[in-house]
Curated annotation (Swiss-Prot):
Functional note: Scaffolding protein involved in the icosahedric procapsid assembly. Coassembles with the capsid proteins to form the procapsid, in which the scaffolding protein is found within the external shell of icosahedrally arranged capsid protein subunits. In a subsequent step the scaffolding protein molecules are released from the procapsid. Facilitates assembly by binding to gp10 hexamers but not the pentamers and locking them into a morphogenically correct conformation.
Lineage of source species: Viruses, Duplodnaviria, Heunggongvirae, Uroviricota, Caudoviricetes
Keyword Nucleotide-binding listed: no
Keywords: Viral capsid assembly, Viral release from host cell
Name this polypeptide is given: Capsid assembly scaffolding protein
Length: 310
């Protein structure tokens, strides 16, 4: 029995379901006459109008095409604009505050005393000597020793009393003259304190160091205050340097520690205090070249300054 055309096509995997004619030529003509989308076995191709504008931003629709739709674990999606700058960010999940560590604090040892500080210190001393000379001259004019003691106490405290004003005026010093003199002295004191604070690194740094001393070494804090009142700049600098180093160790850069070593607490040992016997010995130690170049020597000297009792 001769094979039909259908049998021939069937041997190549073609059945009657896809044949629209009795011959291949007739089938091709019938298929070409159909609408493109209706051709059997073809994929439908749909053409759309050209968009009026083109946007390369895959996030323009407000949806992250790369995000996992089921991810709800508080991830952050950041959008970058075409010019490379961050355009905005969206956060999912609960808002949480992120704590960051502050910048490392490292104290730089104080160097040479600024010329401005030295000058105002000298002016302050001269001004006080002038006040003492004025009081001594008032004594020669009849001011009593008790009045002199009282005036000094008032001068160092809250100001001259009315009684002292009257006694000074009787000795030849008017109220306006006394007030002017005291105002000048107070201005110099303010200038002196501001210069010391600036020398220490500014108000914030000075306050931090002073507070640190009050908490860890109250005696050193009192020594610093006393040295400032006495205009002892060498002692002021030594105490601030020592306190600054201690402050850095406590609040500054963390010490590098090998991960292979276990931190073992060391049993504290009481330190034996050894101060300078007099100011001349202290100045000699600070004049040593090692004070500027050897940190261990400088720390030893500064510690002896704090331990000194003179």
């Amino acid at each position: 029995m001769a094979e039909s055309n259908a049998d021939v096509y069937a041997s190549f995997g073609v059945n009657n379901a896809v044949m629209t004619g009795s011959t291949p030529t007739e089938h091709e003509q019938n298929m070409l006459s159909l609408d493109v989308a209706a051709r059997d076995g073809d994929d439908a191709i749909v053409l759309s109008d050209e968009p009026t504008s083109h946007n390369d931003d895959p996030y323009a629709a407000g949806v992250d095409p790369f995000a996992d739709g089921e991810d709800d674990e508080g991830r952050i999606q950041v959008r970058i604009s075409e010019d490379g700058n961050e355009a905005g960010f969206d956060t999912d999940g609960d808002n949480s505050e992120v704590e960051t560590e502050g910048e490392d604090v490292e104290f730089e040892p104080l160097g040479d005393t600024p010329e401005e500080l030295s000058q105002v210190t000298e002016q302050l001393g001269q001004h006080e000597e002038g006040f003492q000379a004025m009081v001594e001259q008032a004594v020669e004019r009849g001011l009593s020793a008790d009045s002199v003691s009282r005036i000094y106490e008032e001068y160092e405290a809250d100001g001259i009393s009315e009684k002292s004003y009257a006694e000074l005026e009787a000795a030849g010093y008017s109220r306006a003259f006394v007030d002017s003199y005291i105002s000048g002295q107070e201005a110099l004191v303010d200038q002196y304190v501001n210069q010391v604070v600036a020398f220490a690194g500014g108000q914030e740094r000075f306050s931090a160091i002073h507070t640190h001393l009050e908490a860890t070494n109250p005696a050193a804090a009192e020594s610093l205050e006393s040295a400032m009142m006495n205009r002892d700049l060498a002692t002021v600098k030594a105490i601030i340097n020592l306190a600054g180093e201690s402050y850095t160790k406590k609040f500054g850069k963390p010490a590098n520690r090998s991960v292979t070593k276990r931190a073992t607490p060391v049993k504290p040992v009481a330190r034996q205090k050894e101060g300078f016997t007099n100011q001349a010995e202290m100045i000699k130690a600070m004049s040593d070249p090692r004070y500027r170049s050897d940190s261990a020597y400088r720390q030893m000297v500064e510690q002896k300054v704090i331990d000194s009792s003179f």
